[in-house]
């Protein structure tokens, strides 16, 4: 539970805008941290970010469909489908992580019409 609280705190200092970056086969939701509250780069932090990233990974067609639904719904995000993920520490609390992802996508700033950028990246 402490790990989930740490993830929750990290998301609280993340700007509420994100890019969906088109890689070779998959699209990933990339969030942007505030300069005033940078997310520290540590092994544990990177593990948390990878854990969260795996929860909201989607392929390019799903990403385009997601953007369409987001626009049509006025900013309300459909809940992303959760994929199987094996936690290196053996902790599996998918319900808590699902709630955390849903909370992030339904934050009021995101619903208020912030732009969602779709960009291509060769570095994925």
Curated annotation (Swiss-Prot):
Any one Pfam family match given in the protein's UniProt record, by short name: B3R
Organism superkingdom: Viruses
UniProt xrefs under InterPro entries: Poxin-SLFN/SLFN_N (IPR031450)
UniProt record similarity statement: Belongs to the Schlafen family. Subgroup poxviridae B3 subfamily.
Entry protein name: Schlafen-like protein
Native organism: Vaccinia virus (strain Copenhagen) (VACV)
């Amino acid at each position: 539970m402490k790990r989930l609280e740490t993830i929750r705190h990290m998301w609280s200092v993340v700007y509420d805008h994100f890019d969906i970056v088109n890689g070779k086969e998959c699209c990933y939701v990339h969030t942007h941290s505030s300069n005033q509250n940078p997310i520290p780069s540590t092994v544990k932090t990177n593990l948390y970010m990878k854990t969260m990233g795996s929860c909201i990974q989607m392929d390019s067609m799903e990403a385009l469909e997601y953007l369409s639904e987001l626009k049509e719904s006025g900013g309300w995000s459909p809940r992303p489908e959760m994929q199987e993920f094996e936690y290196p520490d053996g902790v599996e609390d998918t319900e808590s992580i699902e709630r955390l992802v849903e909370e992030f996508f339904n934050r009021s700033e995101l619903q208020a019409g912030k732009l969602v950028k779709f960009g291509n990246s060769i570095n994925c």
